[in-house]
Amino acid sequence: MVSTVFPHDFLWGAATSAFQVEGAYNEDGKGLSLADLRSMAIDPAEEPTKALANVGDTLADSRVASDFYHRWQEDLRLMKELGLKSYRFSIAWTRIFPNGDEAQPNAKGLEFYDHVIDRLREYGIEPVVTIYHFDFPC
């Protein structure tokens, strides 16, 4: 039997995408992404007003997801307790540039990710950031 040993610096970890975990789809200046619209089954070309409105329960998946946006401190604490050495996550483009074409980034979005990265480092968890994970701005 062959024994496989992982290197001592192997990054055991977890991974998520912003759309799948963050929720808070319309908070702190975040814009709608194509993934948000797909979850609503709305064609922005046909229904632009409805696409930009708060459409209630039809946006359940991206509206709440696992609520990482509000529960990130607890979630990262649990990752630390698990002994994870890395966390690969994506940054929601629409949280930084809500419409995708702003000259200045959304300060609240930057602040959120700064806090997440700072806490990961505090816990000794290596942040591995994906800039784009299927959440192109509308």
Stretch-by-stretch model annotation:
Residues 13, 71, 112:
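Charged catalytic carboxylate motif
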Residues 20-25:
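Short, solvent-exposed loop/turn elements at domain surfaces
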Residues 56-81, 101:
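Asp/Glu-centered strand-loop micro-motifs enriched in Gly/Pro and often flanked by an aromatic residue
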